[in-house]
Each structure stands twice: as C-alpha cells, then as structure tokens.
C-alpha cells in the first residue's frame, strides 16, 4: 500500500510505499478523520500523529466520509457532495464510492501530519514550500501579521513580483476582500436608512388601507341594513293591504 503523507505547516507532500503488512495494521479498521500514532511505520516516525484524510482502492474509487462500510456502494450524489463534480446545473448521478473504514484493499491511503515527532522526515518536514499567493481576505491578513483593528491592512498585503525580461520589475497586489472603509460604512448606513424608510412607508400604507377598508365595510353594512329595513317595510305594507282586503270581503 502507498501512503500519501502531507504536512500543512511546510506545504510538503510525500508518497511512500509500505510493503510490510505489520506496519499498516495500525491503520486497519480505523475510520476517516481518526488520529493515529505513526510509530509503527519506523524509527524516524516516533512521536508523529497522523490523521486519516481519505484514500483510493485498487480500482481507483475514493473513500467517502459517512459511509460506514469496508466495501463499495453506489450512491446518488449531487452538488455539494464529496467524490462528485456536477457538469450541469442540478445534475445528480449514481457513483461508486468506497466506505470510510480502512482495510487491506486500498492502494493509496492519504494521511495528514497533526503532530510532529522528534526527528525530521527528509522531503517532508525539513523543507518548506513557499506559498504562491498571500491571503486576500482582510481578517486573514490581520491574523497572519497579528494586527489589531486599528492597523491599516492595506500596508501589509503580500505583493506578487512580476519580472519580465527587458521590462521594469513591478509587483501585483490582490484586491482586499471584506475591507471595512468609510465608503462601506456609508453604504451600510444607507441600506439601513432605506430599510427603515420602506418599513415606515409600508406601515403608513397598511394603516391607510385598514382605514379605507373599515370605511367601506361600514358603508356596506349601512347599505345592507337599509335594504333589510326597506324589505321589512314592503312586507309589512303587503300584509296590511291583504288584511284590509279580506276584512272588506
């Protein structure tokens, strides 16, 4: 089995092949996201703790978190699921995925170093791969340089050098996202003011409508009562005329 081990602190990754079954037994029957001591891999791994982040079986099917089985299952996957990338909007597809429990049928197991041990691993912990781009979000720039809210983030943006042959060297900086400026605060105040204005207008319109509705209902009630009174008068008039006619006979 191959072990694809990464160390986020240095940005390095290393693929090692382990033929000895006894060294791998420590990972068997463990689930994804479990932290395991890597002492069994050899003397240089003493003190290291790794997290199982995934893997692929011998046919190339990936492990999926949450599928509690050793074998392969076919799941209906949609946008947002791991192990699937939709090609069309709203597309769903039934795909074969492997369970999240590690066993001997895997060809590659992905591990992430959580805790560094006593010794350095050549090509993994002794070298550092510099990041190609710096942070873009304002809060992340603050976190990187340990800045307070009063400090100006724009001065600390990591600039990317653009060196072309025969041209003047220049640098390029990303646009800072979520940067709080007076203009942003003004926009926020305007949004809140407009919202309050809309609420006030809606309340006034609702009150006006309720007033008009009450007026119309009162008019309709008066009209109905008038009609009822008219009918009663007519019926009483008919009754009195029929009585007088019968008495005359």
Curated annotation (Swiss-Prot):
Mark the residues carrying the PTM (3R)-3-hydroxyarginine. Answer: 137
Q: Which UniProt keywords apply?
A: Acetylation, ADP-ribosylation, Cytoplasm, Hydroxylation, Isopeptide bond, Nucleus, Phosphoprotein, Ribonucleoprotein, Ribosomal protein, Ubl conjugation
> Which GO CC terms are listed, alphabetically?
cytosolic small ribosomal subunit; nucleolus; nucleus; perinuclear region of cytoplasm; small-subunit processome
Tell me the segments the record calls region Disordered: 217-249
Q: Which residues carry this modification: ADP-ribosyl glutamic acid?
A: 35
Q: Which positions hold the covalent cross-link Glycyl lysine isopeptide (Lys-Gly) (interchain with G-Cter in SUMO2)?
A: 14
| Ranges that cross the membrane | none
Instruction: Give the Phosphoserine positions (modified residues).
Output: 148, 235-236, 240, 242, 244, 247
What post-translational modification information does the record give? Answer: Ribosomal protein S6 is the major substrate of protein kinases in eukaryote ribosomes. The phosphorylation is stimulated by growth factors, tumor promoting agents, and mitogens. It is dephosphorylated at growth arrest. Phosphorylated at Ser-235 and Ser-236 by RPS6KA1 and RPS6KA3; phosphorylation at these sites facilitates the assembly of the pre-initiation complex. Mono-ADP-ribosylation at Glu-35 by PARP16 inhibits polysome assembly and mRNA loading, thereby inhibiting protein translation.
Q: Does the keyword Transferase apply?
A: no
Q: How does it assemble?
A: Component of the small ribosomal subunit. Part of the small subunit (SSU) processome, composed of more than 70 proteins and the RNA chaperone small nucleolar RNA (snoRNA) U3.
Q: What is this protein called?
A: Small ribosomal subunit protein eS6
The record's gene field reads RPS6
């Amino acid at each position: 089995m191959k072990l694809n081990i990464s160390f986020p602190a240095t940005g390095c990754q290393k693929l090692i092949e382990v033929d000895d079954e006894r060294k791998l037994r420590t990972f068997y029957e463990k689930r994804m996201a479990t932290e395991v001591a890597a002492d069994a891999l050899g003397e240089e791994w003493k003190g290291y703790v790794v997290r199982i982040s995934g893997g692929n079986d011998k046919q190339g099917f990936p492990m999926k978190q949450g599928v509690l089985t050793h074998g392969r299952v076919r799941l209906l996957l949609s946008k947002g699921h791991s192990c699937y990338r939709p090609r069309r909007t709203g597309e769903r597809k039934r795909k074969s995925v492997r369970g999240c429990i590690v066993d001997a049928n895997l060809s590659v197991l992905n591990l992430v170093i959580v805790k560094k041990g006593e010794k350095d691993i050549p090509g993994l912990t002794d070298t550092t791969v510099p990041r190609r781009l710096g942070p873009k979000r304002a809060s992340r720039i603050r976190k990187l340089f340990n800045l307070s809210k009063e400090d100006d983030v724009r001065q600390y943006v990591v600039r990317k050098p653009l060196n072309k042959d025969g041209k003047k060297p220049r640098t390029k900086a990303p646009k800072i996202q979520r940067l709080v400026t007076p203009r942003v605060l003004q926009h926020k105040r305007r949004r809140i003011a407009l919202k309050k204005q809309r609420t006030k207008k809606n309340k006034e319109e609702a009150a006006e409508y309720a007033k008009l509705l009450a007026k119309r209902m009162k008019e309709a009630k008066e009209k109905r009562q008038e009609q009822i009174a008219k009918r009663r008068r007519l019926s009483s008039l008919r009754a009195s005329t029929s009585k007088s006619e019968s008495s005359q006979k």
